[in-house]
Each structure stands twice: as structure tokens, then as C-alpha cells.
Amino acid sequence: MGVAGRNRPGAAWAVLLLLLLLPPLLLLAGAVPPGRGRAAGPQEDVDECAQGLDDCHADALCQNTPTSYKCSCKPGYQGEGRQCEDIDECGNELNGGCVHDCLNIPGNYRCTCFDGFMLAHDGHNCLDVDECLENNGGCQHTCVNVMGSYECCCKEGFFLSDNQHTCIHRSEEGLSCMNKDHGCSHICKEAPRGSVACECRPGFELAKNQRDCILTCNHGNGGCQHSCDDTADGPECSCHPQYKMHTDGRSCLEREDTVLEVTESNTTSVVDGDKRVKRRLLMETCAVNNGGCDRTCKDTSTGVHCSCPVGFTLQLDGKTCKDIDECQTRNGGCDHFCKNIVGSFDCGCKKGFKLLTDEKSCQDVDECSLDRTCDHSCINHPGTFACACNRGYTLYGFTHCGDTNECSINNGGCQQVCVNTVGSYECQCHPGYKLHWNKKDCVEVKGLLPTSVSPRVSLHCGKSGGGDGCFLRCHSGIHLSSDVTTIRTSVTFKLNEGKCSLKNAELFPEGLRPALPEKHSSVKESFRYVNLTCSSGKQVPGAPGRPSTPKEMFITVEFELETNQKEVTASCDLSCIVKRTEKRLRKAIRTLRKAVHREQFHLQLSGMNLDVAKKPPRTSERQAESCGVGQGHAENQCVSCRAGTYYDGARERCILCPNGTFQNEEGQMTCEPCPRPGNSGALKTPEAWNMSECGGLCQPGEYSADGFAPCQLCALGTFQPEAGRTSCFPCGGGLATKHQGATSFQDCETRVQCSPGHFYNTTTHRCIRCPVGTYQPEFGKNNCVSCPGNTTTDFDGSTNITQCKNRRCGGELGDFTGYIESPNYPGNYPANTECTWTINPPPKRRILIVVPEIFLPIEDDCGDYLVMRKTSSSNSVTTYETCQTYERPIAFTSRSKKLWIQFKSNEGNSARGFQVPYVTYDEDYQELIEDIVRDGRLYASENHQEILKDKKLIKALFDVLAHPQNYFKYTAQESREMFPRSFIRLLRSKVSRFLRPYK
């Protein structure tokens, strides 16, 4: 906005001034001068000063006399009392005694110092500020303090970037700015035709050779403590008249014989000057040497009164101010840490806590409320958090979950074949064998299938693919004979809305039963699995919540039909029989499709009538949002039924598993039947949460023909780690065990004991290193554990799950916000990996990057590094490059419109790596953003550093930077609650200066 567009406050000030002056003017108008208009004769003395009847100047003191009054100007003013004018102490040759700037104020003056200096205790001299003491001056490598300023320096092989703080690795070849011999003292800019152009940092001038930079008085006062003059040879230093030059030619020392001198040239008259000097010599005032006060001086009727600002205490001499160590008293009021600084103190918090805006209290950071904290479940603890994985998954990299390959550990406990599946596994048997009830052992099949066993069916539910999944299981006890051929097929139905349910298949006798082989006992035996993935549709009247929204539902039905070898005839061989059965199966599927389409597919489970409907049910606003499958309402929340219970739809609550059943998972709608022992008197326990709770099972180290008592101990040379098994595993290689009833391979008497990272080979009787992609944390094992999911190890012989790493490069690249992430973060990244990202923002937008922290091992001699350039060329303009660990955050803008980013690691040491967020902003704000990120105050305070590490606060800042209109989403109160006052003041001053540059 131009000047003409601003409000002109002149008229308002005139009205205000008139109102302030009106009462005194009225009093003066009614006052009578002494000796006029009074009655003759002796009268009581009137105190004109007390009644305000005097005509002394506003800057004068009124002293009552027996017959009148006397006016005299206050210290710091001159005149005869009825007219007083301010003395300009800064106008003399000594500049008021100030070595830098002297600011005249009514009745007094104040000394100020240039940037890079601080006022000494005498209130006149200026001392250098050592910026390197606070957070290394914000320098990435080395900070060097100089008079009036500081400089960042880089280690050998690096040069200082444009932001004057970070260091960039030099290239060995090429003619661009990335070459170590480009010749520029400060800033190198790419020029046309492959050449370079040099520029200097603010406060320096480019030398005639167009390469070197000459210091001027505009940068750090030219390195001079007091006065600086620019000459052809550079800055020339001089000292205030009351000081003498140090031998270093820059510092100034106080003279011992200095006295205050007043010359005729800087006084109104010689007489007035003499009076003023005499008065100040006779009476100590704040106008002379600040009254001797360290900080604040105030003239009173009894002389000067010294006081100290908050954070200091006045000493016994009544002049000196001493810093108060607030941390010595009740820890400064800080919850955790207190750090004393000159004139104040800072509170800090332990890791995992954040400082609240009162800048004293610490609050636990709820990491679980942030995005991307854990792959599956997150558990918040005071000061930390823990990730947990769903059943069938293993935690790696602290926060990630990968599928567990159960088959890699003792073949999953399977007697014959183990097949790993996502989130689970299953045991299978060779032809001629059937799976035992314990789902691990295999039993030889003898004779034909029985025809009189009534099937038992249950529905198993759990989380799958982000939703609820229900799996129909048959426990009919019907087994396949060795001459049976299996035909499998599946069909999927898609519906708009439905409810998981289960009922006998007799609902479709007209089509389904005739389609099945006649030699089998029941159609129900043909349902091997039915997979229902849907919303339960269960509504709880009267409970608070939103009405459920229509959801799509998928029902996958998988049929497994059996054909018997005895059906083969001379005219139709086994292949012919299979084709006929497939034809019947397709007919059965068509019948089922029609039933679903006609809404004749009705199922029932646990007292609930659960239907499949083509139209979504009507819901009232009072009806609560439906809970997931296997969940009930408790205190207006959906709670999964715990292990050992199931959800009963009729009673709408969790019920204990009845005798003879068990359930080892949460959120189920049925209980599994306990295996039936030959001894019918075996103990059955209600609320069984595991198969072993059913009672009567053989214990680890034991076995029997059916897995139930009576049991035998595993023979010498065998072991069994699980309960309810029908056999024991051999040690192999002719190895014996230390005793009967062994429960693990570690009980086998091997010739050598293998250390972690190895497994015992029973053929060669040697210890073999675990191959790449596996690990073994224990002694004396005969296997190695496969790494979870898509992870692998860097080398063979791994001993811990932490050595399993995901090699995928992480990150999300958006037009406005995004992040890049090293592989396996926050776990250690893998060896010999390479990642590249390209950030190409929309037109007229620039890139701001925040590196909260980065962990790269310095021991590798820069074998692992992160670099950000304009292009992949090593000679292109580089914005950032590092090969070290920095736990102190830094923010910077890209030197180019787009960024090519590369992370590379060698085969040496590893570390956590990084997660680096970025935001793109309107290029019109370039000057403002640069001003903010280059200000050392952004990083000086540990509290400010924590802001740049706080994912929630960074997200809010980036949200506003990317889309400024989002600023209005945050109220002023919210902003104050999110950020400390010092941070808001810093940003407000810079934004105000950016928006109103002429004020």
C-alpha cells in the first residue's frame, strides 16, 4: 500500500492534544498573578506550586517561597525556569560519552550500539558480542568470532553456501561454481557459456580482480570496536576521545585520566555552559555517566536512584546490577531443565516432551496423533511411544510392520508342508494324508469318506485390507481319500450394502443340491471356505453417533468339490468325470447368483439375522454408527470382544466361550470347537483363550496318537516344542538329546554350539552363517529366521531383527508440500543404497526445506551423503550437502527453481538417516522467507529449535506458507497456544517490515 493509502492521524492527534491541554488552560485563565486583585492586609501564604497556580515550564521545578514561588529547570534542561529547553547531550564533541550512537531524549540521553555489539555496564562503551557461544552461531562446521560479527568456516574440501551457514562439498573437476578452484572469495554465480561471476556478502565490496571481497564499515563496523572509516585500503579504526587504541588496531581501552569536557561550541552560551557543568559537578544526575548506574537511572529529589531490569538484582553499592540465577530457586519454575542466561533463563524439556507456551511447563508429545508414526498400532507412553504389529507381522525399523514368515522357524511347526501367507501361514499335507485337528500334523487317510458325520461350521472374522473380513470354516470331520480328485473354483458377488451372515445351505435345494456328486453325504460339505468382506450393518438404537453410510460389500464363495475314482466307466474316464463335475459346479454358481440377485441369500449367526440387501437400509439419526465385526458397545465406544469370548448378536454383548470351545483372537463372532479326544472325560474349561486351555492335551516334549492324554515322552534324539502334537521332530544327523521329553533343538547334543548369526547344519555338523535376508539372535539353533516383509540384511551372519532393512526409498512428493525419507527410517538405512528425488514446483513457486535432524556416520569419511542440486550434474548449483550427523535443525531456501536430491550410502557404517519435509511458496514472498531463515535468532533458542523438530507445528507453518488463506483457519489464541511468544515476536517483526517497508 502506498503512503497516500494510509490513514492520516494528524487530525485525531490534534483533538487529543486539545483535550489534554484544556483543563490546565482553564486553570491558568482564572488564576490571578501575585499582588493583584487581593485585599489589603496580611494574608496567609498561598502555595502556588501545590495549587498549580505557578507559571513554571512543564520541564521546570516549582519551589514555593513565603511571598511567591521560584522556577528552575530540571536537570537535563536549560533556561530561567519559565522557559526551559532540552540540553542535547549528544551534540558535544564527546557524543555524550557514547562510543557508537547517542540518542537524545527529553531531559536525558541514551547510548546504543551497532549490530554485533552490546552496551557495557557503564552505559556508554560498546563490547563485542560472541555470537559463536549461542548454538555455534548457526554454523554447520566452524564458527569464528570477530569484532562486531562472526564468520562461518568450512572444513577442507567444503565451501560456504549462499546462506552463509551451511557447507557444500567441493567438486574436483569442471569449471562451474561447484569446482573447488572457482576463485570467488564469497558467492559464486553461474554465468553464460559455462563461466562464473563472483559476488560478495552484504557489507563487502568486490575487488578490482572481480574475485576477492573487501570488508567495509557496513559489516560488523568494519571490525572496529568504536569508530570506522572506509579508506582505499579498507576500514580504518579509531577510538572515542576518552579511550585509547589497543595494539591490535581494533580494540579500545579506557583512559585513566578522562574527564567530561564541555566546549563553547556545543552550548547555548558560555555562561549557561559553566552553570550546567558546575551544577552537575555539585549534584550527581542521571545526565552524567547515567548517574553511575549500571542500567536504569532516575532523578529524584534526593538524588539519583538506580534500578535493574527483570533478571538482575541491585548490589549493595546501589549502582551495580548482577544477573540473577533464577535456576537456583525452585528450578526457575521449569518442569524439567533450567538453563541460566544473562538477564533471564530458559526452560527445556526431556526428549519426548514439548515446552508449552508458558515457556515453563512440559507436556508429553503424543506421537500417536501424528501421521505416519506406526504402520499398524501405536501406543503412547510419557516421553516416548511404541509401535505394535497385527498378528502375523513382525516389527522392524522401530515403526514398520512386515509379514512374518513363520515357515522359516522350524517349518512353522508343520509336520510336512508349510505355506506362508500374508499375515499368517498354513500347514498342508502330502497326497494320502489329511491335516490333523491341531492344524500341524498330518494323518494318513484310510478308506472312504464317512457319510454320517454332521458338519460344524464357524465364521472367523478379523481385519483385512483396511476392513472387516469374515471367513467361513468347516469342521465337519470329513476327510478326502487317496483316490479323490479335487476341483476348485471361486466366484465374487458385488452388492451395495450387506451384513456378514451364515445359515445352512438348504435355502438353495432346487439348484445347488442336484449339482453336487450324489455319492457325497451333504451339500454343506462342499463349502470349504466362504469369504465375506462387508459392513456388519448392525445398528444400536438410542446410542449416540452418526448414521452409517452405505458401503460396498464383496462376497467371495470358494467351492471345493470332490470326484471319486469309482465313478470312472468305460465311456467316461477320470478327465471326463472332472469335466462333468465342473459343469455341475458352474450350474450351481448360476443358481447362487440368481439367489443373491433375488435377495434370497439369507444367513444367521450367533442370534443375528444378517441379510444381503441390494438397497441400503434406512437409518434414523439417533441410530449409532455400526461397530466392526465382533465388536460391542461399551461406554459409547466400540470394543472388540477379548480372547476367550465371542460377540452374541441376540444379546448384543460379548459372551464367554462355552465348554468344549476356545477362541484365541479378539473380535470374533464364534468360538472354535475344542478337538475331541478319544477320552471323553478330558477336562473342558470355559473362557478358553487357547487350544491348550481345552484340557487333556499332551504338553511340549510329549506326543500321542491323537494329541491327547495318555501321552508319551519324546524319545531320545527327538523334540517337540508345542502342545497337542501326534509326533516329535528328529534332531537329524544321528544326534541324540540330553534326555527324553526334549522341547527344542537346543536340547540336541550337537558337536559344536553355534553362536548367534549361525545355524547348525545336521549334515555337515558345522555352523553355517545365516544367509542374506535372514538372522538368528540365539545360540545353538538349527535354523535362521527370515526377515519380515520385503526387508533384507546388508550381509550374511546377521544376529538381530534390527539388521533387517527395507531398501525402498521413502517420501511423498507434492506440488505444495511433501517430504523425502531415507530407506527404513527411523531404523538404520541399508548399505550400498542410492535414492534420488526430484522436486519440481508449479510456476512462480520456490522451495523451502527444513532439515529437523540428520544422522550420517562421520566415521565413513563422507561415504554416506545427502546432496541437493539443481540437476544431477556435479557441476550444477548446489543448495545443500552434508555427510555428517546434525541434531540441530536448519531451514533454507533452494538456490534453484527445482531440486534434484540424491542420497547414497556405502558398505560401511549405517545410521538413522533423515526425514526432510519441504513446502513450496509464492515467489513474491522470497525476500521475507530468506530474511527469516537466515536470521540466527531462529536457531539461537533451544525452544525455537524444537519448533522446527515438531511435526505438528511444521505442518501448521507449511500449511499457511503453501496456502496463505489457511492462516484464517488458526485463531490468534490457537497461534499463541502453539508457538512461544519469542517466536511469534520474531516472525511478526519480519512480516511487518516486509509488508510496510517504509515505516
UniProtKB/Swiss-Prot annotation:
Entry comment on modification after translation: N-glycosylated.
UniProt-listed SMART domains: CUB, EGF, EGF_CA, Ephrin_rec_like
Residues linked to a glycan: N659
Signal peptide start-end: 1-31
Residues of the CUB domain: 809-921
One Pfam family, short name: EGF_CA
Disulfide bonds: C49-C62, C56-C71, C73-C84, C90-C102, C98-C111, C113-C126, C368-C378, C374-C387, C389-C401, C407-C418, C414-C427, C429-C442, C809-C835, C862-C883
UniProt cross-references to InterPro entries, sorted A to Z: cEGF, CUB_dom, EGF-like_Ca-bd_dom, EGF-like_dom, EGF-type_Asp/Asn_hydroxyl_site, EGF_Ca-bd_CS, EGF_dom, Growth_fac_rcpt_cys_sf
Function of the protein: Lipid-binding protein required for SHH long-range signaling by binding to the dually lipid-modified SHH (ShhNp) and by promoting ShhNp mobilization, solubilization and release from the cell membrane. Acts by enhancing the proteolytic processing (shedding) of the lipid-modified N- and C- terminal of ShhNp at the cell surface. Synergizes with DISP1 to increase SHH secretion. Probable cell surface coreceptor for VEGFR2 involved in VEGFR2-mediated angiogenesis.
Name of the protein described by the UniProt record: Signal peptide, CUB and EGF-like domain-containing protein 2
Biological source species: Homo sapiens
